[in-house]
């Protein structure tokens, strides 16, 4: 079962010819995942700023966020991000992300047991954003990724560049993000692997007469065919029409804020996950996601449940806090 979870993780973090640094594309935010994933246009979620740094804004001054994703009893993802302001330079963030695969039993070439070993990915990141003209913000960040599997390790560095247009009067946001432009410093082998570069575009719009916001996210636009390295059978490959390959790039989601209070109900749909992970003639929810968020005066809680496959469901939790609210006479948003 743990192998299945790892396989699913590799497939949906895959967008280059390399899987060695697929962790660069891991999405940890409960808000984003409940809206279908790859969301880059939600300006009130600090967790999204690790890739789309242009989403940083003054409402996030002295804010902190923790994200936790459980794929199984042993495979867990954790992230932390902090944001604040540099008055002359704009906003900045700093954080860490970790994917723990757990412990594995080692075997030699003859099938005899050796020592247990551990596998994990660890990423450090920092970024800065600044409004360059009215409503348009530029964001830049750097990431350092270290992977350790048994006695093998790999190291890579990459950068992300993003632009966000936020028209508050029209309640409309557009973002474009070029992710993972970098190089391998050290690899598991002598072969130099490619960093999985990704181009994303997103938009969101809040309706004027209904407390509802819809999200459209387009991912991996640098390459048309992202049908993936794994095909269940030749019949599945034959079914890969041009239209279906186009929809592989699309995630959609919606957020309802009932009575305009502090409760948020979310749902999303991931076309690629639906097409590639569903089993024919068997009812299932692969590709669908949902979640709920509750906002308090000084912190908010978010939860998402994602159906990856008929036998795999992920639970994601996010906690975001305004640290200034816990300091007497501190600066509040």
What is each model feature region?
Residues 14-18:
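Sec/Tat signal peptide C-region and signal peptidase I cleavage site
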Residues 1-4, 134:
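Positively charged n-region of N-terminal signal peptides that target proteins for export
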